[in-house]
Amino acid sequence: MKRAFLNIAICALLGTMFVGCKAFHTIQSGENATGKPYELVVVCAQQAWISELGDTLQAILKQPVAELPIYEPMFDVMRILPNNFKSLTERHRNILVVNVSPDIKEPALAVKYDATAKPQVYIVAQGPDNHTLAQYVSENRENLLYVLEKAERDRRVSYASAFPSQSLTPLVEQMFSVKMPIPDD
């Protein structure tokens, strides 16, 4: 009887350790985001990517940065298939997930911050078909770009505040009477 009770207690203890141990959780929202500034992971099925929807997304996201004398895309777009969207890519700093399904009634764009990493912007574009979603994304292109650009600016400001230059920040304050953190790079 004692032996059976001891075996049950050990199994319960081991089970609790496995469930509670953070090593078995692949994603935590406290993890640092990966990726370079202005880099975007687009999670999109091949059929949607080679359609009007994919062309629309590329035209919006890869449009040239204004006021530059040579072509430079607004975002470096990396498209991956949904089945390849796993732990490392889920922690990217900018993610756009494209979901096309006849079960979806109306097209929509949804934004979530710090979904699987910090700092992160996680956007879901969904619609009933490629054509309808392409139209919706095109009509809301300014909102899409605003969210992505603002996230990048906010990250840069946060970095500058966290790691101000020890030589430049006091110099700017002395010369212009403005206290503003300036990063070294």
For every predicted segment, state its role.
Residues 1-31:
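Bacterial Sec-dependent N-terminal signal peptides
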Residues 21-185:
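N-terminal targeting sequences that direct proteins away from the cytosol to non-cytosolic compartments
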